[in-house]
Regions:
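Metal-dependent polysaccharide deacetylase catalytic core of the NodB/CE4 family, i.e.
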Residues: 1-54, 61, 71-88, 114-115, ...
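Extracytoplasmic/secreted proteins, especially bacterial periplasmic and envelope-associated proteins
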Residues: 20-23, 27, 31, 52, ...
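Non-transmembrane alpha-helical segments in soluble domains
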Residues: 29, 33, 54, 58, ...
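Sec-exported extracytoplasmic/periplasmic mature domains
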Residues: 30-37, 108-111, 136-140, 270-274
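C-terminal domain-boundary segment and adjacent tail
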Residues: 62-79, 104, 111, 116-194, ...
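A Trp-anchored, charged/polar loop motif used as the substrate-binding/catalytic surface
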Residues: 92-109, 125
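C-terminal beta-strand-rich structural cap/linker in extracellular carbohydrate-active enzymes
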Residues: 186, 218-244
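Beta-rich interaction/scaffold domains
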Residues: 239-286
């Protein structure tokens, strides 16, 4: 339901033999493609610091980027120059109580020097819930509202599209029309972008719409990270599965109208662009 996927541990006893690990990448990929209706795996999250997995991944073309526990590049989102293909990126592992200090230390640095806080977690408990609540209240919707929390796969695709998408603009009277070409790679799943329109007064914008390929759409007032210049921020998503996800969770709510199921249904419906379909789904969960 929109989450990222990646290779991690594979089912081999030969955990130090790259050829065996690679063979299991191939067999695991077949299972993933079958179970996820054609969606494939293109990332490796290195398990237990085992560099044999890295060697195996470098001989398996579908794996396009690797996240390491140590020895990788530090990801600085405001200083990324390329599309991160075949890049080794370092991730972090912290207990939830330590994460706020890690985040605050990065926020104190100049924008271009800030490292992404890449958090690995194998299970959750009350301490994780408390940390996530702090994150929301400080930097999320109920705080500064400057937080983005993508999976590694989603960030990789977003950065790839930032570097390779082609945006064409056309102005007709009071209407700005954007045509965006987004080239995808092998097993890409997240055809979505945010476009910051400088020189456009957000207060003067009365409506934003998208064509048939756009399934999710939102817009609002934003500012650039470097100099704080005001911009009209347009977020759009072309995932065909967005509508199917929304319909699924609305049906789950109708079968069992609990508060939790209602929250799930509203969450997925809210992702959709304004449309007759969205209105029909909202009426089913009011």
């Amino acid at each position: 339901y929109g989450v990222g996927i990646a290779f991690h541990d594979v089912n081999t006893l030969s955990v130090d033999v790259p050829d065996s690990i690679r063979a299991h990448f191939v067999s695991s990929q077949r299972i993933v493609l079958d179970r996820l209706a054609g969606r494939g795996c293109k990332m490796l999250i290195e398990p237990n610091g085992n560099k044999a997995y890295v060697a195996a991944a470098e001989g398996y073309d579908p794996i396009q980027t690797i996240f390491l526990q140590s020895g990788g590049e530090k990801l600085r989102p405001f200083a990324v120059n390329g599309d991160l293909l075949r890049t080794r990126i370092e991730r972090g592992l912290w207990l939830p109580a330590a994460i706020p200090a890690v985040i605050e230390a990065q926020m104190a640095r100049p924008v271009e020097e800030r490292e992404a806080v890449n958090i690995g977690v194998h299970g959750t408990d009350r301490f994780w819930s408390e940390m996530l609540l702090w994150l929301n209240n400080t930097y999320g919707r109920d705080g500064e509202d400057c937080l983005w929390m993508p999976a590694a796969e989603e960030y990789f695709e977003y950065n790839y599209l930032r570097h390779h998408a082609v945006v064409n603009a056309r102005v007709t009277e009071n209407t700005l029309t954007l045509t965006v070409e987004m080239p995808g790679g092998l097993y890409f799943y997240y055809p979505s972008l945010t476009i910051n329109l400088l020189g456009v007064d957000p207060g003067a914008c009365t409506a934003v719409g998208g064509g048939e390929t756009v399934t999710g759409l939102s817009w609002g007032r934003g500012r650039t990270a470097d100099d704080g210049a005001e911009a009209l921020m347009v977020n759009f998503d072309c995932r065909h599965a967005l509508v199917a996800h929304a319909e699924h969770f609305v049906a789950v709510y109708e079968a069992d109208p609990s508060a939790a199921n209602r929250a799930d249904a509203r969450y997925f419906v809210a992702m959709l662009k304004d449309s007759d379909c969205k209105e029909r789904l909202l009426k089913r969960i009011k």
